[in-house]
C-alpha cells in the first residue's frame, strides 16, 4: 500500500514508541536461540518481539539480538536487574538506538556523564537535580560559569552512578528544565573524542564497550559541532553491518543499533565514511584539559558559551549528517560473533568489562 502524508507521522510515532521498549542484547553465545533469549527476558514482562540476528547464508548467530517489551516499565525493570547471564554467558543489554539517532556523536558510547546545554541564568543546580533524578541516582551536578564574571556559560554536566540513565535520557530528545528547552548529549572525555575521530578517519580498531569511562570531570559534549558529524563506530568499516526492522545501525551501518565493538559489518556507516565531514569544534575548546582534537587548546575557558538556540552548538566546517548507507533489508548483511575481532565478527576485541 502506498504511504500517504497522513500515515508517515503515525508510523514514525509508532516506531518511536517501540524504540523506548526495545533492548539490544550483545555478547550472546552461539548456542543462544530466540527461545532461550525470550525465556530469559520474559521474567521482566511480556515480549512483543524477540530475535537473534543470524548470517543469512550460514544461519549462524552473529552474537547479538533484540528484545521488545510491551512497556517501558518492563525495560526499566530488566535494566535494573543487571548483570544478565544467558546460557552461561554474561551478556550486554543496552537500550537500542534508532537509525536517525545512530550517527550522532556518543550514540553508542557507554558513559555515566551527561552534557546539558541551554542552561539559563535563572536555572540552578536544584532544577537540574529535580528533573534528572527521576532517571536514576545522581552523583554530581556541575553548572559551568565564567571564571571572571561568574555568569553561567549556558551548559553543565550531570553524572549518574550508572550508564543506563544517560542512555535513556539520550533517547528522549526533548527536555524542558525550569521552563527552558535543553539540549542533552553524552559527555565524552578527550580519549573518547579521539577514538571517535580516529574511527571516522579509518584508523580505529575494535574498542568494544563496557565500563562507562564516565567518572571524574574533563568532558566535552562530543566531537562535531551542531552535534552532527562524527560516527561513533569504533573501528573503520565496523559496527553493526546490518540492522533490524528499519532502525538505525551501529556505526558499521544498517538498521537497529546497540553499541560498537562487534566486529565487521558489510557497508553502512563505517568509520570515516562519507556524510560525516564535520571537522569543526562546536565550542572551540575542551573542558578541563580534555579538549583534544577539534576542540581546541583544551582548557574549559576555550569551551565557549552556550548562547545559541538548542541544536546549534557552533559553526560547522562541513556537515551532512545522516544519509543512507547501504541500509539493506531488515535482516541483511554483516557478520557478528561473540568471539574474536576483525572483519568477520566479533564481540570481544577490547571489551571493557
Curated annotation (Swiss-Prot):
Changing residue 266 to A: Decreased methylation. Does not affect subcellular location. It is found in: Nucleus; Nucleus, Nucleoplasm; Cytoplasm; Cytoplasmic granule. CDD domains: RRM1_hnRNPA2B1, RRM2_hnRNPA2B1. The gene is Hnrnpa2b1. Residues 21-104, 112-191 form the RRM domain. In the brain, isoform A2 and isoform B1 are abundant in large ganglion-type neurons, such as Purkinje cells, and are less abundant in neighboring glia cells. Isoform A2 is more abundant than isoform B1 in brain. In testis, isoform A2 and isoform B1 are present in spermatogonia and spermatocytes, but not in spermatids or sperm. Isoform A2 is more abundant in the adrenal medulla than in the cortical cells. Isoform B1 is found in both adrenal medulla and cortical cells. Isoform A2 is more abundant than isoform B1 in the adrenal gland. The modification N-acetylmethionine is found at residue 1. Keywords: Acetylation, Cytoplasm, Isopeptide bond, Methylation, mRNA processing, mRNA splicing, mRNA transport, Nucleus, Phosphoprotein, Repeat, Ribonucleoprotein, RNA-binding, Secreted, Spliceosome, Transport, Ubl conjugation. GO terms for molecular function: DNA polymerase binding; G-rich strand telomeric DNA binding; miRNA binding; molecular condensate scaffold activity; mRNA 3'-UTR binding; mRNA CDS binding; N6-methyladenosine-containing RNA reader activity; pre-mRNA intronic binding. This is Heterogeneous nuclear ribonucleoproteins A2/B1. A motif (Nuclear localization signal) lies at residues 9-15. Residues 202-223, 320-353 have a biased composition (Gly residues). The modification Omega-N-methylarginine is found at residues 38, 203, 213, 228, 238, 266, 325, 350. The modification N6-acetyllysine is found at residues 168, 173. The modification Phosphothreonine is found at residues 4, 140, 159, 176. The disordered region, when incubated at high concentration, is able to polymerize into labile, amyloid-like fibers and form cross-beta polymerization structures, probably driving the formation of hydrogels. In contrast to irreversible, pathogenic amyloids, the fibers polymerized from LC regions disassemble upon dilution. A number of evidence suggests that formation of cross-beta structures by LC regions mediate the formation of RNA granules, liquid-like droplets, and hydrogels. The modification N6,N6-dimethyllysine is found at residue 104. The modification Dimethylated arginine is found at residues 203, 213. Residues 308-347 are annotated as: Nuclear targeting sequence. Asymmetric dimethylation at Arg-266 constitutes the major methylation site. According to a report, methylation affects subcellular location and promotes nuclear localization. According to another report, methylation at Arg-266 does not influence nucleocytoplasmic shuttling.
Amino acid at each position: 500500500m502506498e504511504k500517504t502524508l497522513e500515515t508517515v507521522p503515525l508510523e514514525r510515532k509508532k516506531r518511536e514508541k517501540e524504540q523506548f521498549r526495545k533492548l539490544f542484547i550483545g555478547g550472546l553465545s552461539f548456542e543462544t536461540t530466540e527461545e532461550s533469549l525470550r525465556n530469559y527476558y520474559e521474567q521482566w514482562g511480556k515480549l512483543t518481539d524477540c530475535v537473534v540476528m543470524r548470517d543469512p547464508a550460514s544461519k549462524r548467530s552473529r552474537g547479538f539480538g533484540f528484545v521488545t517489551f510491551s512497556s517501558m516499565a518492563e525495560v526499566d525493570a530488566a535494566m535494573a536487574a543487571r548483570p544478565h547471564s544467558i546460557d552461561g554467558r554474561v551478556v550486554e543489554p543496552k537500550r537500542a538506538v534508532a537509525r536517525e539517532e545512530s550517527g550522532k556523536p556518543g550514540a553508542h558510547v557507554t558513559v555515566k556523564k551527561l552534557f546539558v546545554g541551554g542552561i539559563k541564568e535563572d536555572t540552578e543546580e536544584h532544577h537540574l537535580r529535580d528533573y534528572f533524578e527521576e532517571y536514576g541516582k545522581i552523583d554530581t551536578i556541575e553548572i559551568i560559569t565564567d571564571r571572571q564574571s561568574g555568569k553561567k556559560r549556558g551548559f553543565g554536566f550531570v553524572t549518574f552512578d550508572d550508564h543506563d540513565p544517560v542512555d535513556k535520557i539520550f533517547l528522549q530528545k526533548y527536555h524542558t528544565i525550569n521552563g527552558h528547552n535543553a539540549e542533552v548529549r553524552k559527555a565524552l572525555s578527550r580519549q573518547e573524542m579521539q577514538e571517535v575521530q580516529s574511527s571516522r578517519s579509518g584508523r580505529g580498531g575494535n574498542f568494544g564497550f563496557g565500563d562507562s569511562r564516565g567518572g571524574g570531570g574533563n568532558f566535552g559534549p562530543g566531537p562535531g559541532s551542531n552535534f552532527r558529524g562524527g560516527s561513533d563506530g569504533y573501528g573503520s568499516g565496523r559496527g553493526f553491518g546490518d540492522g533490524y526492522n528499519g532502525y538505525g545501525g551501529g556505526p558499521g551501518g544498517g538498521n537497529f543499533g546497540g553499541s560498537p565493538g562487534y566486529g565487521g559489518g558489510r557497508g553502512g556507516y563505517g568509520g570515516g565514511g562519507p556524510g560525516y565531514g564535520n571537522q569543526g569544534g562546536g565550542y572551540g575548546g575542551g573542558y578541563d584539559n580534555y579538549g583534544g582534537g577539534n576542540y581546541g587548546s583544551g582548557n574549559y575557558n576555550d569551551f565557549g558559551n552556550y548562547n545559541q538556540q538548542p541544536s546549534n552548538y557552533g559553526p560547522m566546517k562541513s556537515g551532512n549528517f545522516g544519509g543512507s548507507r547501504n541500509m539493506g533489508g531488515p535482516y541483511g548483511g554483516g557478520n557478528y560473533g561473540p568471539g574474536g575481532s576483525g572483519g568477520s565478527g566479533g564481540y570481544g576485541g577490547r571489551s571493557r568489562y
